């Protein structure tokens, strides 16, 4: 009841006290859900390991464990959990998808594609698996094969933002900047809060030396989300290339204050006025 009422702290206390009296799989399952909801990932991981030992034939336990490992960026453990789920239930498309995602996290593109393909064979409309396979193929510069997956996704949903962004990256990589710009613009029109759309479009403008357009675009992005650290970062880069050193320094300072973890990524970015593209969530 405490869980349903939005009192996770009290729910954790109740479940923990119940488990101190007796190990119960169902209670453990409820507690693991609360841990995940409250981002207590280490506790969730440990509890799911206990659940797996208590009842080792539950596929769902290993799938949940694999998802927790993904959030922890522990791809080795994620692969192990997904592989265990496959051993229990070979035909589970989600298990193959999670193993493919783990392999991608381990930079094993070939095996990632193999398991994602298995997931798609098992579930033809598995959009997430197709998108991830398209990303893996794009990393390997297999653009035609990647486009087959993207086309399949867009045939189901013409406004799938992730597929449109990836198509834009492929168009950009293959020299069709106009088509890339159209895809990025379409995403920002569909969803003005899609940060990646603004980043890709602004980065494209910077590469094309359309610096006033890039700055204006990032002005808009920051107006929509004043805590958008990467937008400050990219606007600062555009300002420096446009001759506004003071404005660039100010934007860089704000970006670092908003996201201190990115200090290393920012280092040296402006000193050489580099026009290199920044990494993005698709890893491209």
Region annotations inferred by a language model:
Residues 4-5, 37-38, 71, 105-106, ...:
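Register position in tetratricopeptide repeats
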Residues 22-23, 56, 90, 124, ...:
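Short coil turns that delineate tetratricopeptide repeat
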Residues 25-27, 59-60, 75, 93-94, ...:
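Helix-start (N-cap) detector for alpha-helical repeat units in TPR-like alpha-solenoids
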Residues 30, 64, 98, 132, ...:
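Canonical tetratricopeptide repeat
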Residues 241, 246-284:
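Terminal, low-structured helical/coil segments at or just beyond the last alpha-helical repeat
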């Amino acid at each position: 009841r405490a869980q349903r009422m939005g009192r996770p702290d009290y729910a954790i206390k109740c479940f923990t006290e119940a488990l101190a009296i007796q190990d119960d799989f169902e209670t453990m399952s409820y507690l693991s859900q609360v841990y995940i909801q409250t981002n207590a990932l280490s506790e969730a991981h440990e509890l799911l390991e206990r659940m797996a030992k208590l009842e080792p034939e539950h596929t769902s336990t290993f799938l949940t464990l694999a998802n927790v490992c993904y959030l922890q960026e522990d791809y080795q453990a994620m692969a192990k959990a997904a592989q265990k789920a496959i051993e229990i239930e070979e035909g589970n498309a989600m298990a193959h998808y999670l193993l493919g995602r783990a392999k991608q996290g381990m930079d094993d593109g070939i095996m990632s594609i193999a398991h994602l393909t298995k997931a798609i064979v098992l579930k033809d409309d598995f959009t997430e698996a197709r998108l991830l396979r398209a990303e893996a193929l794009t990393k390997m510069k297999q653009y035609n094969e990647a486009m087959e997956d993207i086309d399949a996704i867009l045939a189901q949903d013409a406004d799938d933002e992730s597929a449109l962004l990836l198509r834009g990256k492929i168009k950009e990589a293959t020299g069709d900047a106009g088509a890339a710009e159209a895809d990025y613009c379409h995403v920002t029109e569909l969803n003005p809060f899609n940060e990646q759309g603004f980043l890709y479009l602004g980065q494209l403008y910077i590469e094309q030396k359309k610096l006033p357009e890039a700055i204006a675009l990032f002005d808009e992005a920051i107006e929509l989300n004043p805590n958008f650290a990467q937008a400050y970062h990219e606007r600062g880069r555009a300002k420096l290339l446009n001759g506004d050193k003071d404005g660039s320094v100010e934007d860089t300072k704000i970006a670092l204050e908003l996201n201190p973890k990115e200090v290393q990524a920012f280092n040296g970015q402006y000193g050489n006025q580099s026009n290199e593209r920044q990494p993005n969530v698709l890893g491209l």
